[in-house]
């Protein structure tokens, strides 16, 4: 019976050996830097393909019709179909194909019959009777703010408000494309304002804490917050510059009237009051955000300069304290030197009288006091910091 049991165990041994061999290979691959780099590249490629699929050449998007209804939610459109159907250039879809959450550089590209908008995390193709919102149901437009944006976008495209009263005319006179662009700007500025409030609250709290005590952790938090404010300021500044460039180009503003171009009534070069007023309104909002962030960064910079002055002053005080201790030790060493000479086991004819000890002690004290006073006097001269000496000031006169 024992022999039979041993035979029944023998076939299981190769399975255990295979398992341990496989585990060893996996452990060896994970410890290999080249294998880890390959895994990282595959992961990044998989993430980048969430929006743009290079094999199928499709881009995920949501289409709104002329009535503001969501016609096709989260569909995949071919890249070449988008280019040929809507009169785009291949380079126009580069920003759309990126999978980053926030694109730092905003842009508004005006084409023959469409407007391609890329602001913060919103990328859309606006036409006179259609709006294509890229990646609307993907990883980026799944938050509460983006859901609110889609709801507000539908209301504006349908040309009605959320508090519309029956039997009362409450229509927006702006054309379809301007209502879509306005909704995108409103969502972008709302996101900027929300992010600004967070940065202001955090920065104000750190600055108030630094008024009571300066610690290493608080300085580290201040540095991190300053970096975040710099990125946010750059993002807001680029958005303001983009709107300002649009306002300076009269031909581009006239080309943004897609509905009138479709009706065969193109605008004159200087006849763009509606879109100009619309852009100026949001330019003022963005400019206010930029100025607020700039003032906060200026306050942080001023606080950093004051902290550096305080730390430099404390460091100088510590250095002066160390110098005073060194001066005291030097003076004491001078008196000890006199005493050591007196205490040598040599004939010096001073020991024969009774005045030797008082004389040596007096000389040691006098030497110690002289060295201390002389060193402290020169130290006080070094403490007095002047912009220019009397001789230089007299020559400058």
UniProtKB/Swiss-Prot annotation:
Residues 1-48 form a transit peptide. It is a multi-pass membrane protein. CDD domains: Mrs2_Mfm1p-like. It comes from the Eukaryota. The keyword Membrane applies. Disulfide bonds: none annotated. GO terms for biological process: mitochondrial magnesium ion transmembrane transport. Pfam families: MRS2-like. Mitochondrial inner membrane magnesium transporter required for mitochondrial magnesium homeostasis. Modulates the conductance of the MRS2 channel. Involved in the splicing of mRNA group II introns in mitochondria by affecting mitochondrial magnesium concentrations, which are critical for group II intron splicing. This is Mitochondrial inner membrane magnesium transporter LPE10. It comes from Kluyveromyces lactis (strain ATCC 8585 / CBS 2359 / DSM 70799 / NBRC 1267 / NRRL Y-1140 / WM37). The gene is LPE10.
């Amino acid at each position: 019976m024992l022999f039979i049991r041993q035979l029944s165990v023998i076939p299981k041994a190769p399975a255990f050996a295979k398992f341990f061999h496989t585990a060893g290979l996996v452990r060896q691959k994970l410890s290999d830097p080249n294998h880890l780099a390959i895994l990282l590249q595959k992961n990044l490629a998989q993430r980048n393909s969430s929006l743009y699929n290079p094999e199928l050449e499709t881009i995920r998007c949501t289409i709104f019709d002329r009535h503001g209804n969501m016609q096709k939610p989260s569909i995949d459109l071919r890249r070449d179909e988008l280019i040929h159907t809507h009169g785009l250039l291949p380079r126009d879809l580069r920003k759309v194909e990126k999978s980053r959450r926030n694109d730092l550089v905003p842009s508004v590209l005006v084409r023959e019959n469409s407007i391609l908008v890329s602001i913060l995390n919103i990328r859309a193709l606006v036409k006179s009777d259609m709006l294509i919102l890229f990646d609307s149901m993907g990883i980026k437009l799944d938050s509460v703010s983006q859901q609110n944006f889609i709801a507000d976008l539908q209301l504006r495209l349908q040309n009605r408000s959320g508090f519309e009263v029956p039997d009362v005319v409450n229509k927006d006179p702006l054309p379809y494309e301007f209502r879509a662009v306005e909704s995108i700007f409103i969502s972008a500025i709302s996101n900027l304002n929300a992010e600004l409030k967070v940065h202001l609250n955090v920065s104000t709290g750190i600055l108030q804490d630094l008024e009571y005590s300066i610690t290493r952790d608080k300085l580290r938090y201040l540095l991190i917050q300053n970096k975040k404010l710099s990125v946010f300021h750059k993002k807001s500044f680029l958005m303001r510059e983009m709107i300002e460039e649009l306002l300076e180009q009269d031909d581009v503003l006239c080309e943004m009237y897609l509905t009138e171009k479709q009706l065969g009534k193109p605008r004159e070069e200087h006849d763009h009051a509606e879109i100009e007023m619309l852009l100026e309104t949001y330019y003022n909002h963005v400019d206010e955000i930029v100025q607020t962030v700039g003032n906060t960064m200026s306050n942080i910079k001023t606080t950093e300069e004051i902290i550096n002055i305080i730390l430099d002053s404390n460091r100088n005080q510590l250095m002066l304290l160390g110098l005073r201790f060194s001066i005291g030790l030097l003076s004491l060493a001078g008196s000890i030197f006199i005493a050591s000479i007196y205490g040598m086991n040599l004939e010096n004819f001073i020991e024969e009288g009774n005045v030797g000890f008082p004389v040596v002690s007096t000389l040691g004290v006098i030497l110690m006091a002289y060295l201390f006073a002389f060193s402290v006097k020169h130290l006080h001269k070094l403490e007095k910091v002047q912009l220019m000496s009397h001789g230089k000031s007299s020559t400058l006169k």
